[in-house]
């Protein structure tokens, strides 16, 4: 079967992992491809489009807002930048120079992964909590809520939390710590 990738000399693979960017993401449903094809025929104001997308994402997820990005790394970079700068365009224009801004992001050591490069590229200081290996035996464990709380100070902009199948502590506990810190 001849396809666009074979014409470029790229060998197709079988992706049994799911929507992983490094494996091409997910195969789009025909309705999605049709909508993209239709959208490509028009020019629109991107701010207005993002506003409409935000409303749709919020309505369907129950979140306060939403933002469409090109992938997970872009989403992490933009959300970290938003936590550091707020709505201040002067601060936005200074990035990755975060001097004088709330520029610390707290993260469990066991949550470290290649996506934290996107977070660090904003110019933040990554503050690690917990012990990285929770499977080795006595005295070795994952982060505890109190460790997140102890790491938060006046320069903390965010907590970077990665949800895995067995992530500890649970997200609700970390959110409670963040809200208690203000």
Model-based region annotation:
Residues 21-33, 43-52:
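A structural motif shared across PLP-dependent enzymes of the aminotransferase-like
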Residues 2-23, 27, 54-68, 73-182:
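Conserved PLP-enzyme active-site core in the AAT-like
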């Amino acid at each position: 079967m001849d396809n666009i990738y074979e014409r470029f000399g790229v060998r197709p693979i079988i992706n049994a992992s799911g929507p992983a960017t490094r494996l091409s993401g997910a195969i789009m449903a025909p309705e999605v491809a049709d909508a993209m094809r239709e959208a490509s025929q028009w020019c629109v104001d991107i701010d207005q489009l993002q506003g409409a997308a935000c409303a749709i994402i919020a309505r369907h997820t129950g979140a306060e807002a939403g933002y469409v990005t090109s992938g997970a790394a872009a989403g992490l970079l933009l959300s970290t930048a938003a936590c550091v700068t707020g709505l201040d365009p002067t601060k936005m224009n200074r990035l990755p120079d975060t001097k004088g801004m709330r520029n610390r992001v707290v993260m469990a050591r066991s949550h470290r992964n290649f996506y934290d490069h996107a977070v660090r590229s904003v110019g933040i200081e990554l503050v690690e909590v917990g012990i990285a290996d929770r499977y080795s035996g006595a005295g070795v464990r994952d982060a505890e809520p109190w460790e997140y709380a102890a790491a938060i100070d006046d320069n903390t902009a965010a907590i970077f939390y990665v949800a895995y199948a067995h992530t500890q502590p649970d997200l609700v506990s970390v959110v409670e710590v963040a809200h208690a810190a203000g």
